[in-house]
C-alpha cells in the first residue's frame, strides 16, 4: 500500500530521482505534477497500536499475557543512523486489498492523529513512527530542545533529515504494535535490550519466593512503560521496623505491610526500576 509524503526542500534532480527509485521511493504522476510516495510496511499489530493506548491490569497473569502477546509480534533490527529518513505522511494512493493492508490503514489513521511521521530505513518500505520514538530519534540525530515539539511535522522531519545525514554509528529500532516505537543507539555502550516479559516474570518469581506473603495490587501499561505493584508481608520487615521504632520508644502493634513497584520500558522512558514504600 502506497502513501504520498510531504517533501521539504528542493526537488530532487533526475539523477537523484533514479537513485531514490532504487531505494524504494516511487514517483506517481498526478494532475498538475507528481507525488513522491513510499510503500508502507505491513507491521504486525494487535489492538494496542494507538499512540495514546493505556491499559490497567487487575490480575498478575494479565500483565504477563499482555507482555508476551506484544513481544511475540515485536522485532529489533539495526540500521546505520545516517540512512534513516523521516517524512510527514500524505495521502493513501491505493485502496487496501488484503487484511494486512486494511489494518495498516487503521494504524495510519492513528499515526496521522499523533506523530504524523513515517520512518524510511535502508529497506524499501517505510515504517510508521510512533510518538514514543521521537525522543530517541532526536538523540540519534544529536539534536534536542523544547522548540522541536512545537514545529510542524514536515519541518521537524526536515530538521531530523539534515542532521541524520551526518549521524554516526548504528541505530537499534524497536518495532512493535504497528509502528517504530524507539530508535536506540546500537553502539557498544548503547542501549541494552532486556525483554520486558523476562523482567516482569523474574520480578514475579522473586517476590513470590522471597516474601512470606505477597499480593498483586495492580499493573499498568502504555506505549512508553509498564509497571506492576505488589503488597508484601514478611517477618524480617516487621523485625527491622520494630527495632527502629523501639529506638524512639514506640511499639508496633499493627501488622506491617510494604509495597514494591517495578517499572521498566523498552523505549528508554525508564530503566528497570524497583521502588519500595
Go through the PLM ranges and name each one.
Residues 2-202, 210:
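Feature for intrinsically disordered/low-complexity regulatory segments and propeptides
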Residues 1, 191-277:
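Intrinsic disorder/low-complexity polar-acidic segments
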